[in-house]
Regions:
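N-terminal G-site of the GST-like fold
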Residues: 1-120
Length: 122
């Protein structure tokens, strides 16, 4: 049996943006916004920023069920965040969810508005 060398992490890790396939750009190892772009805001206090992914659908179903039950405070505006185009890295979205993941909810019924992100938290 031969001994293998122990792994030693690099002192400086460099991210190679070019590595990866079509969906490699939906995640990145750096924090913060990659570009300036404000998020749209509709007429309801709850603003949902999401996409039709399983986690995004969970929140939409929840809000639709609450609205169907007559809970007026659950009325919301939904906005598409196209993760394939990197919209989750916009300055507006990162202000709501610093993790740059969908879904994210912004509740304007409080001052300042309350940020809620990750489907389980919403």
């Amino acid at each position: 049996m031969s001994e293998t060398a122990a792994y030693a992490p690099a002192k400086v890790w460099t991210w190679n943006k070019e590595v990866g396939g079509k969906f490699a750009a939906i995640n990145r190892p750096t924090a913060g916004a990659s570009h300036e772009q404000a998020l749209p805001v509709g007429k309801h206090p709850l603003q949902l920023y999401s996409l039709g992914t399983p986690n995004g659908v969970k929140v939409t179903v929840l809000l639709e069920e609450l609205v169907e039950l007559g809970i007026i405070d659950a009325e919301y505006d939904a906005w598409l965040i196209n993760i394939q185009d990197g919209e989750q890295f916009s300055s507006g979205f990162v202000e709501v969810n610093p993790n740059s993941k969908i879904p994210a909810l912004l509740d304007h019924s409080t001052t300042p508005p309350t940020r809620v992100f990750e489907s389980g938290a919403i």
